C-alpha cells in the first residue's frame, strides 16, 4: 500500500548512494534505478493481495511479470512486513 512506499524509496536511495554502499561494506555500483519500471502492475490492492501472504504473493507476481514482459531475468523485491 501507499504506507509502504517509503520502504521502497529508501531502498532505491540507498542502492544509488555510493557513500551508503561503502558504509555497508561494498563497492558494487547498482547504477541509476529505472523509475519508469517501478511498480508496473499497481499496488498490492490492485493485484489482489491476500492478507498474510505478503512474501509469496509479491514473489509470484514478480516471477509472472518477468515472464510476461520477457525483457528481464532479474528483479528487486522489497518487503517491509513481519
Language-model-detected regions and their locations in the chain:
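Claisen-condensing/thiolase-fold acyl-transfer catalytic domains that form or cleave C-C bonds
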Residues: 1-82
Amino acid at each position: 500500500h501507499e504506507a509502504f512506499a517509503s520502504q521502497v524509496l529508501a531502498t532505491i536511495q540507498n542502492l544509488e548512494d555510493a557513500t551508503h554502499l561503502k558504509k555497508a561494506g561494498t563497492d558494487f555500483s547498482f547504477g541509476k534505478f529505472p523509475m519508469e519500471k517501478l511498480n508496473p502492475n499497481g499496488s498490492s490492492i490492485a493485484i489482489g493481495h491476500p492478507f498474510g501472504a505478503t512474501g509469496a504473493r509479491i514473489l509470484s507476481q514478480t516471477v509472472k511479470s518477468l515472464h510476461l514482459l520477457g525483457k528481464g531475468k532479474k528483479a528487486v523485491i522489497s518487503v517491509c512486513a513481519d
